[in-house]
Design a protein with these regions (language model features):
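Active-site acidic/histidine clusters and adjacent loop/turn architecture
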Residues: 15-70
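Compact, glycine/acidic-enriched structural inserts
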Residues: 110-169
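C-terminal edge-of-domain segments
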Residues: 188-228
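Generic structural signal for well-ordered, non-transmembrane alpha-helical segments
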Residues: 42, 46, 139, 206, ...
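Soluble extramembrane domains of integral membrane proteins
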Residues: 57, 63, 69-93, 99, ...
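Aromatic/basic-lined ligand-recognition segments
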Residues: 70, 88, 168-176
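Short, charged, low-complexity amphipathic alpha-helix
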Residues: 1-27, 185-186, 195-199, 222-227
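Aromatic- and glycine-enriched beta-alpha-beta binding-site module
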Residues: 75-135
Length: 228
């Protein structure tokens, strides 16, 4: 199946499940989910697969491993709503745990969409290794960041930071923010002008993913340096 854009029915399903968030409603509308949500998400993944393999030949691309499950795990949360009203795709190395992983993501919700690259949550060991690299080779780290052309691609750096972490004197001013990060993710400033219904959506996402590949490999290097 070719990706032709996410149909309006995808977002409509999310809105409907938000207001009828129960198992009986989902079972009555399972065919809608399969047709209007699951199928276009799988086509989206397949369309991006060659680019993701060019970034990392070990990238997990099986749709059932990449797509978030619509059914929520409610065992440890106060919100007992059984279903999500949005979905996301994660591209990360096959066989690695999600928590603390280095990954690319795409998310679609009734309120909009977003995508980018970075870490899934906090990974203190990995970020400590990145901090040591910033201290040891600030020019090298800066060069990697420059290769991503964040300004030209209108990308923003996000992530929670340590508020009281002492930054070594040798860290350049432009890397102090990076040094203090507890996690890191890069995403577009805005996706409001991008048409979610267009088959060209994958082209835009692919361009951004490829532009962020130097950062992906910088983070992968830190991830792989974590002691066993």
């Amino acid at each position: 199946m070719m990706f032709t854009g996410f149909p309006e029915a995808t977002v409509q399903f999310f809105l409907d499940i938000r207001f009828h968030n129960n198992i009986a409603y989902f079972e009555e509308n399972r065919a809608r989910y399969e047709r209007d949500v699951k199928a276009p998400f799988e086509a989206f993944i397949q369309e991006l697969a060659p680019a993701m393999l060019s970034i990392d030949p070990q990238m997990e691309l099986r749709p059932y491993r990449c797509m978030a499950r619509l059914r929520r795990d409610v065992r440890f949360t106060k919100d007992k709503s059984p279903f999500r009203d949005h979905l996301w795709v994660l591209f990360r190395r096959a066989g690695e745990p999600r928590e603390g992983s280095v990954m690319y993501w795409f998310e679609l919700a009734p309120s909009g969409m977003n995508w980018g690259a970075g870490t899934w949550g906090e990974n203190r060991q990995m970020m400590d290794i990145l901090r040591r690299r910033i201290v040891a080779d600030p020019d090298g780290v800066r060069n990697v960041i420059k290769q991503c052309h964040l300004t030209e691609h209108h990308m923003l750096v996000g992530g929670n930071s340590f508020k009281r972490l002492e930054v070594p004197a040798g860290v350049p001013d432009d890397l102090k923010g990076w040094y203090a990060l507890r996690e890191v993710y890069i995403s577009p400033e805005s996706t409001a002008s991008v048409d979610v219904h267009s088959p060209q959506l994958t082209k835009r996402v692919q361009e951004d993913f490829l532009s962020l590949s130097p950062l992906y490999h910088l983070l992968r290097g830190a991830y792989e340096a974590i002691p066993p």
